[in-house]
Design a protein with these regions (language model features):
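Short, Lys/Arg-enriched N-terminal segments with co-localized hydrophobic residues
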Residues: 1-8
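Hydrophobic, small-residue-rich transmembrane alpha-helices and their short perimembrane loops
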Residues: 8-158
Length: 158
């Protein structure tokens, strides 16, 4: 007969995988979103130069908008790490699921935010108008990532 202490397993590896997924999926989405927005910003500046128009520097903001989701993934990863204090199976599975799913949602939000930022850069280059409205729409997509982060933190704290 084995001692009950011998049967106790350490499930911290599940928590670590959840931490990595939260950060990596968020960062991948941010990277793809930033590339999409950056390419459109560069194309927008090119249109301005060709047409002899002023090049709006604010398009740098469009290009960088998806990068904030990497920060959210990092924050989520840090909050998941709190479960390392008690690496039970239930905390391991919860951390893994939250890391994968919330990380993916945050990353997808960044990807689509990059697409909207790309359209915004193109529209601003064409018209020179609507900057505030473009940032409002970009911010709406940002809200999905923020809600995901906050709701994930609430679940982790239960």
């Amino acid at each position: 007969r084995r001692n009950s202490k011998e049967l106790k397993m350490d499930y911290s590896f599940l928590i670590y995988i959840g931490m990595v997924c939260a950060l990596c999926f968020s960062a991948v989405g941010s990277g793809f979103g930033a590339v999409k927005a950056s390419l459109a910003s560069v194309g927008g500046w090119q249109k301005c130069y060709i047409n002899g128009k002023q090049d709006p520097f604010i398009m740098v903001g469009f290009a960088g908008a998806p990068l904030t989701q990497t920060i959210y993934g990092f924050l989520l990863s840090n909050f998941i790490s709190a479960k390392l204090a008690t690496p039970t199976l239930s905390y391991g599975i919860m951390s893994l699921c939250i890391g994968i799913l919330a990380g993916a949602v945050i990353g997808i939000s960044a990807l689509f935010q990059g697409k909207v930022a790309a359209s915004s850069a193109d529209a601003l280059a064409e018209t020179g108008k609507g900057t505030a409205k473009y940032f409002i729409v970009i911010g709406i997509i940002e809200t999905v990532a923020l809600f995901t982060l906050v709701f994930s933190l609430l679940i982790l704290n239960n």
